[in-house]
């Protein structure tokens, strides 16, 4: 039996070695036929000795039984998105912001990568073995695609090499090469199956198959671009260093990753990649530019849901020509009137486009647009279609002027445009059915009050039937009233009522965001909630006081102040509170007023804790006035080291930062 085990081990080692050479090093040593022969030999041996099959065997990529549905995986470290720039001027402005924020004349080097047009995934390895994989999802929670990811040959089931961390989350992009995409569509046309519009859709559809056996037949591949969870091990202190280390462990990394010493070198890299784009063999839509130093990344931090130390420099979007058949005007949540061009449908970058935004009246005037014109359409950022210009040389004789409305197309209220602003707005407020619908949709959305099951179509019907006028009216709904809506049976109606009841318990930050105050997104709402602590304090705040909140300037402060000065808004808030909407009392975290050994200190947690979860530890430290950071820098005051602490502990010792263990932390928390 020992000889069989040895034979299996040698075959698996040989196959993994050749997968590494093929997918990571791009330097295969053997023909595909020889690889296939070795795989057949391994599969035959494992069939005869199923008790010796291991989870990391190359044969285990073929796919398991179909799933009924995907389960959810919560990301321990959120998967953030990136801000975009679309021209050199915007990139240079980003470069200047980075330099200005560092304020210490430190040299910034940039790690530049291809922006792959695929699907972002996170892959967790424990002791070097792949244990789970998830999609990005909403950034905090993704779908469990472990079975499907295991079928992708480019992704190692087991890392090889030395000093592999106990827990390592590899992040990257799963994508479909152009040749594989064409083959899939060729097969689909021959068999009458689904034809995909572009490789990204094909990759996403392949990766989100409930049957992993289907995924296994798709030639998906993968490139790593970063790290999430890191426990029980060390990594280099530069982004490029980390990517090179991943490559040594067997994780595929693009060979186009380049270190640039200046903004000029970054621009040269961008233009070179743009030139090479047609010959790459897979789709990209730009380059990603990251500050290479991890210490500088820590100093720069994050804003909302994106890092300040990275940006995606997008390529010019693909363009097509078509005709404008009409221009209609939509009314948004804040009353903004947006002209929308109705187009003769045309395919742009693999997507059928029939509408395009015209932004505002100034944009229509700038374009000189008339109804009936031939126009150039671009998918800005490869996402939102917009009209780039009018083809004046081919203007038909029967074009018509675009007349911007003076009254709301929905409620008839006056349309006003404040001097200095580009946007015209309906003055109807919640009297306007369109504003009411959009405001309510925002109020119940996942990141606001998070009312499960309350979809857009339900909101539309509630407003049209005049069941609901303000957000507070939602909490007065009964199952009986809801059953009067289309496709709303008693069970679903009761589920919605239960969800509304559950949503009454929220947080101050979510509540503020749900109110839909102009210019107040999630990050600003969280900042206001943390600074003022109570609704009463925020309502009473002056414009000057509001500007003391980080990232709140005069414009946002004015919008917040004006919102709470409006009697109708205060009445809606009072009604919501009367209906039972509530949140926990604020936790005082003024370090100057807290008698705690952690007050005012920047603390970093590393390693695993045995007596409490990391989240609980963070919460207790924040309550006691600490700022909990994610990495060690010169600004760190204290490092708490649990079991298997790695690079953070080493860096703390190198910098002479105070280090305590979990037992000492618990003692201090108790004091």
UniProtKB/Swiss-Prot annotation:
Enzyme Commission number: 6.5.1.2
Domain BRCT: 593-671
Database matches in InterPro entries: BRCT_dom (IPR001357), BRCT_dom_sf (IPR036420), DisA/LigA_HHH (IPR041663), DNA_ligase (IPR001679), DNA_ligase_AS (IPR018239), DNA_ligase_CS (IPR033136), DNAligase_adenylation (IPR013839), DNAligase_N (IPR013840)
Gene Ontology molecular function: DNA binding; DNA ligase (NAD+) activity; metal ion binding
GO BP annotations listed: DNA repair; DNA replication
Sites where the protein binds NAD(+): 32-36, 81-82, 113, 136, 173, 290, 314
Top-rank lineage group of the source organism: Bacteria
Gene Ontology CC: cytosol
Keywords for this protein: DNA damage, DNA repair, DNA replication, Ligase, Magnesium, Manganese, Metal-binding, NAD, Zinc
Cofactor: Mg(2+); Mn(2+)
SUPFAM superfamilies: BRCT domain, DNA ligase/mRNA capping enzyme, catalytic domain, Nucleic acid-binding proteins, RuvA domain 2-like
Enzyme class per UniProt: ligase
Catalyzed reactions per annotation: NAD(+) + (deoxyribonucleotide)n-3'-hydroxyl + 5'-phospho-(deoxyribonucleotide)m = (deoxyribonucleotide)n+m + AMP + beta-nicotinamide D-nucleotide
Binding site for Zn(2+): 408, 411, 426, 432
Active site (UniProt): 115 (n6-amp-lysine intermediate)
Family, per entry: Belongs to the NAD-dependent DNA ligase family. LigA subfamily.
Function: DNA ligase that catalyzes the formation of phosphodiester linkages between 5'-phosphoryl and 3'-hydroxyl groups in double-stranded DNA using NAD as a coenzyme and as the energy source for the reaction. It is essential for DNA replication and repair of damaged DNA.
PANTHER family: CHROMOSOME TRANSMISSION FIDELITY FACTOR 18 (PTHR23389), DNA LIGASE (PTHR23389:SF9)
Listed name of the protein: DNA ligase
Species of provenance: Shigella flexneri
Gene name per UniProt: ligA
């Amino acid at each position: 039996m020992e000889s069989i085990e040895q034979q299996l081990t040698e075959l698996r080692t040989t196959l993994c070695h050749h997968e590494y050479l093929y997918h990571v090093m791009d330097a295969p040593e053997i023909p595909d036929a020889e690889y296939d022969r070795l795989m057949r030999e391994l599969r035959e041996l494992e069939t005869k000795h199923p008790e010796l099959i291991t989870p990391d065997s190359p044969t285990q990529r073929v796919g398991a039984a179909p799933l009924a549905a995907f389960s959810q995986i919560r990301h321990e470290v959120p998967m953030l998105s990136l801000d975009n720039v679309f021209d050199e001027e915007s990139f240079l402005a980003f470069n200047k912001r980075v330099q200005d924020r560092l304020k210490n004349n430190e040299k910034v080097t940039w790690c530049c990568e291809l922006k792959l047009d695929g699907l972002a995934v996170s892959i967790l390895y424990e002791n070097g073995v792949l244990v789970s994989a998830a999609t990005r999802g909403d950034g905090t929670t993704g779908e469990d695609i472990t079975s499907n990811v295991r079928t992708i040959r480019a992704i190692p089931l087991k890392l090889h090499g030395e000093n592999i961390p106990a827990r390592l989350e590899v992040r990257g992009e799963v994508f479909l090469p152009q040749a594989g995409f064409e083959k899939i569509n060729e097969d689909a046309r021959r068999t009458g199956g689904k034809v995909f519009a572009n490789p990204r859709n094909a990759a996403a559809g392949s990766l989100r198959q409930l049957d992993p056996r289907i995924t296994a037949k798709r030639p998906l591949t993968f490139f790593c671009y970063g790290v999430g969870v890191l426990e029980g091990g060390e990594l280099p202190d530069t982004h490029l260093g980390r990517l090179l280390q991943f490559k040594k462990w067997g994780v595929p990394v693009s060979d186009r990753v380049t270190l640039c010493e200046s903004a000029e070198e970054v621009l040269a890299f961008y233009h070179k990649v743009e030139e090479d784009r047609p010959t790459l063999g897979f789709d990209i839509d730009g380059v990603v530019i990251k500050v290479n130093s991890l210490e500088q990344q820590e100093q720069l931090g994050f804003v909302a849901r994106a890092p300040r130390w990275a940006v995606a420099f997008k390529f010019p979007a693909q363009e097509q020509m078509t005709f404008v058949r009409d221009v209609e005007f939509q009314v948004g949540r804040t009353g903004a009137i947006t002209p929308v061009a109705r187009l003769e449908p045309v395919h742009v970058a693999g997507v059928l486009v029939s509408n395009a935004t015209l932004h505002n009246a100034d944009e229509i005037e700038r374009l000189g647009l008339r109804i009936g014109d031939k126009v150039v359409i671009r998918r800005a950022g490869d996402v939102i279609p917009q009209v780039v210009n009018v083809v004046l040389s081919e203007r038909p004789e029967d074009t018509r002027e675009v007349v911007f409305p003076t009254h709301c197309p929905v409620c008839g209220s006056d349309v006003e445009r404040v001097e200095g602003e580009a946007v015209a707005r309906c003055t109807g407020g919640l009297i306007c059915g369109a504003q009411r619908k959009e405001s309510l949709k925002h109020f119940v959305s996942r990141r606001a009050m998070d009312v499960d099951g309350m979809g857009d179509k339900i909101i539309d019907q509630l407003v049209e039937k005049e069941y609901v006028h303000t957000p507070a009216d939602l909490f007065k709904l009964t199952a009986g009233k809801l059953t009067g809506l289309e496709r709303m049976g008693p069970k679903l109606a009761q589920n919605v009522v239960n969800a509304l009841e559950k949503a009454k318990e929220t947080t101050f930050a979510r509540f503020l965001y749900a109110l839909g105050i102009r210019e107040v997104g999630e990050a600003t709402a969280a900042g206001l909630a943390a600074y003022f602590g109570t609704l009463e304090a925020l309502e009473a705040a002056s414009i000057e006081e509001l500007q003391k909140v980080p990232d709140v300037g005069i414009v946002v402060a004015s919008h917040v102040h004006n919102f709470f000065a409006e009697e109708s808004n205060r009445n809606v808030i009072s009604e919501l509170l009367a209906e039972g909407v509530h949140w926990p009392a604020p936790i005082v975290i003024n370090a100057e007023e807290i008698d705690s050994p952690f007050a005012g200190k920047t603390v970093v947690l590393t390693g695993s804790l045995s007596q409490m979860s990391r989240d609980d530890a963070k919460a207790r430290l924040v309550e006691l006035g600490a700022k909990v950071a994610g990495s060690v820098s010169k600004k760190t005051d204290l490092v708490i080291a649990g079991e298997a602490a790695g690079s953070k502990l080493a860096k703390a010792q190198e910098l002479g930062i105070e280090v305590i263990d979990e037992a000492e932390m618990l003692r201090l928390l108790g004091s």
